[in-house]
Design a protein with these regions (language model features):
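Active-site-proximal loop/short-helix segments
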Residues: 16-29, 75-116
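Generic structural signal for well-ordered alpha-helices
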Residues: 1, 69-73, 125-134, 166-167, ...
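The substrate-binding groove and active-site-proximal loops of carbohydrate-active enzymes
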Residues: 47-66, 111-125, 181-188, 220-227
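Acidic (Asp/Glu)-rich catalytic clusters
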Residues: 1-4, 170-174, 199-209
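Aromatic-lined carbohydrate-recognition surfaces of secreted/lumenal glycan-active proteins
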Residues: 5-18, 82-89, 114-162, 209-221
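Surface-exposed substrate-engagement region within the catalytic domains
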Residues: 188-232
Length: 232
């Protein structure tokens, strides 16, 4: 701040551990481990493809993440809360309706509808995002809340991954103050050219209250991202 810079806290909401499902490797004080050891809360944490995740469909999980964001805003002089692009993991046609939080989906009122699991999962993410936004604004109205989703909109709207409703976020003041898509490709990328992807995001944003910032990865400069050397 003394140098005129804004500082935001970057959070990754659902991931507990990557590359391991061994709960004993977590601290004994880790809530994910405590939840796993209790039959009543065991499904608050899910193992999937070698990693551990908080279950997006559980209210206790949502409360934990919201309170974490609120704690940061209350105790640290940050200008914003910035959520990373990791939401639901990726499924496929054989397990999309049976893996991960499918049990919670089937037990919900939406579980009676064929293929409703996509809407169900998006609903869980929306509930979390809206709750974080409300908590941040209630704590310090001047602190912003934004999300940095993956850059390719088609991937975000897939029925197999993420389950983020970016169109709703971009056109409502109840979810985010800004969206910062990670457009980490060059102008010569074979299917995600920087200018085309950027224009698509700008076209999707219709609310004047939600800003769109383009996320550029400086660390990829000079690497093969589909850009010519002159464009790097």
């Amino acid at each position: 701040h003394a140098n005129g810079m804004k500082i935001e806290a970057w959070i990754n909401p659902y991931r507990v551990a990557a590359g391991s499902t061994n709960y004993s490797r977590l601290s004994s004080k880790n809530l994910a481990r405590k939840w796993h050891n209790n039959k009543k809360t065991r499904r608050n944490v899910l193992a999937y493809r070698g990693s551990l995740y908080y279950n997006p469909a559980k209210a206790q999980v949502r409360e934990l993440i919201v309170n974490g964001a609120k704690e940061i805003v209350q105790n640290y002089d940050v200008d914003g809360i910035h959520m990373d692009d990791y939401f639901y993991p990726t499924f496929n046609s054989s397990n999309v309706n049976s893996a991960f939080d499918a049990k919670e989906y089937k037990a919900s009122t939406m579980g009676k509808h064929k293929n409703g699991i996509v809407a169900f999962r998006r609903q869980q993410v929306n509930a979390l995002v809206k709750a974080i936004h409300s908590a941040v604004k209630a704590t310090k109205p001047n602190v912003t809340f934004g999300i940095s989703p993956a850059g390719n909109i088609d991937n975000l709207t897939s029925k197999y991954s993420y389950y983020v409703d970016v169109n709703k976020w971009l056109n409502s003041h109840d979810y985010v103050d800004y969206i910062c898509p990670q457009i980490y490709w060059g102008f010569k990328h074979p299917y995600a050219k920087f200018d085309r992807v950027t224009k698509r995001w700008m076209k999707a944003a219709k609310s004047k209250k939600v800003k769109v910032y383009i996320g550029i990865a400086v660390y990829r400069a000079g690497h093969n991202t589909g850009a010519s050397s002159s464009e790097r």
